[in-house]
Design a protein with these regions (language model features):
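A short glycine-rich, His/Asp/Glu-containing loop-to-beta-strand
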Residues: 32-67, 124
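Glycine- and acidic-residue-biased ligand/ion/polar-headgroup-sensing regions
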Residues: 70-90, 99, 129
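Bacterial N-terminal signal peptides that target proteins for export
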Residues: 2-13
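Short acidic-glycine-tyrosine-enriched beta hairpin
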Residues: 59-60, 89-106
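Bacterial N-terminal signal peptides
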Residues: 11-21
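Ligand-binding loop in jelly-roll beta-barrel domains
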Residues: 73, 92, 106-132
């Protein structure tokens, strides 16, 4: 049998978790239609507290990723199609299949499919272990 004081702590902790979860969900912007990021692999690195995440971003014609940031370096390679890469403070750049780019941590950016075909980009992210790969920005 659980003691009443322990039971109160458990109920309070559960309630706090639910309230915090609702707050996070309410603040998240809606998902971008026509954009999908599929994880390929995730592994710890030799540097303590760091991990690498690889994912394929698929951007349908006319769609975009939406403005977002990453907590670490993004090293990306365009597998298929063409994208327009918009990085805050820089002119937009066109990246075609076979081209690569690097985005520094915390940099606000957006990728748009260009050229009327699906664009697929392989992203490699070096991040602190347990952090989300991407954070949407309004």
């Amino acid at each position: 049998m659980i003691r009443p004081s322990t039971q109160r702590i458990i109920v309070s902790a559960a309630a706090a978790f639910v309230v915090a979860s609702i707050g996070v969900y309410a603040q998240a912007p809606p998902a971008q239609t026509g954009f999908k990021r599929t994880p390929v692999q995730q592994a710890d690195l030799s540097v303590p507290g760091k991990e690498v995440v690889q994912a394929i971003a698929e951007i349908q014609p006319g769609a975009q990723s939406g403005r977002h940031t990453h907590p670490g370096e993004e090293v990306a390679y365009v597998l298929e199609g063409t994208i327009t890469l918009e990085i805050d403070g820089k002119p937009a750049a066109t990246k075609k299949a076979g081209e690569a780019f690097i985005i520094p941590p915390g940099t606000i950016h957006n990728a748009k499919s260009a050229g009327g075909a699906v664009a697929r980009v392989l992203g490699t992210y070096i991040i602190d272990k347990g952090k989300p790969v991407a954070t949407p920005v309004q």
